[in-house]
Amino acid sequence: MTGRGRAEVALALVDSVDGLGPDWLARVEAAQRAHPAEPAVQAAVGAVLAERQLWGKARRPLEMAAKDPQLQGRARRQAWRALARLATEEGDDARALECLRLAAAQD
């Protein structure tokens, strides 16, 4: 699969992450190991880990996706929103608000 094809599949996964089962964890972690520099793959990994509430593992790929200017705005926005949920889970309301502000600023 080409890089563009991987990005399309990864972004489709980000959009449909609600309710994904644990069987997806191994798949996205394998994709992350195989393509660690691809922002769309990081976005998908972070989204799946966040959906499973694996916040510690989700933080790094979500931060990478949120901050990558090559990634589509909607995927960056979703990453910032997931980071806001993570901050809320940790009781860091100031960080949660900052993440929501950054999510709103995405095009």
What residues fall within each predicted segment?
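TPR/TPR-like (Sel1-like) alpha-helical repeat modules
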Residues: 1-6, 63-67, 85-107
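Alpha-helical adaptor scaffolds
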Residues: 2-72
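Generic anion/oxyanion-binding catalytic loop in active/binding sites
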Residues: 47, 84-85
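C-terminal soluble interaction/assembly domains
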Residues: 74-78
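Small/polar glycine-rich anion-binding or flexible loop at a beta-alpha turn
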Residues: 79-83
